[in-house]
């Protein structure tokens, strides 16, 4: 039986890097390595001076949770319309739900937890399929 590794990630030691979206920066929390790739968790923040694309897409996941730590973000979701998430808001994005970003604040920070740790993202023509 494989045991997950113990990991602690402190903000004071944090490095943010470019990732999936060019208009965001990502801080890896070490969960992917600790779980052998089963889960990824990162803090995402708005990248200064970058414009968001608003490109409709979906993720091939088992589970995806977003919790807003600071600021706000708006998404348009398939079958749900536009949803604004503010500090303290949490959303579970079902596997394969089509969505796109509508906008976000300059001070946006959010926690994202996704299973599996490596997942595919596919661009789609529209949110409504």
Enumerate the predicted regions with their spans.
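Short acidic-glycine-tyrosine-enriched beta hairpin
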Residues: 79-96
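A short glycine-rich, His/Asp/Glu-containing loop-to-beta-strand
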Residues: 15-57, 62
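Short, conserved beta-strand element in jelly-roll/cupin
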Residues: 43-46, 58-75, 113-116
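Short beta-strand segments in beta-sandwich/barrel cores
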Residues: 52, 71-76, 90
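Conserved catalytic-core motifs of eukaryotic protein kinase domains, centered on the activation segment
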Residues: 78-80, 103-104
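Hydrophobic/aromatic beta-strand elements that line small-molecule binding cavities or substrate pockets
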Residues: 43-45, 89, 99
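Double-stranded beta-helix
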Residues: 2-11, 17, 100-129
């Amino acid at each position: 039986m494989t045991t997950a590794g113990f990991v602690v990630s402190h903000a004071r030691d944090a490095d943010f890097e470019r990732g999936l979206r060019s208009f965001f920066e990502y801080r890896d929390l070490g969960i992917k390595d600790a779980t052998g790739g089963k889960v990824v968790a990162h803090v995402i923040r708005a990248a200064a001076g970058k414009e968001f694309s608003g490109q409709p897409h979906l993720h091939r996941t088992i589970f995806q949770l977003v919790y807003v730590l600071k600021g706000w973000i708006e998404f348009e979701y398939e079958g749900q319309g536009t949803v604004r998430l503010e500090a303290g808001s949490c959303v579970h994005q079902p596997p394969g739900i089509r969505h796109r970003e509508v906008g976000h604040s300059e001070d946006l920070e959010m926690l994202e937890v996704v299973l599996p740790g490596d997942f595919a993202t596919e661009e789609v023509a529209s949110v409504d399929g």
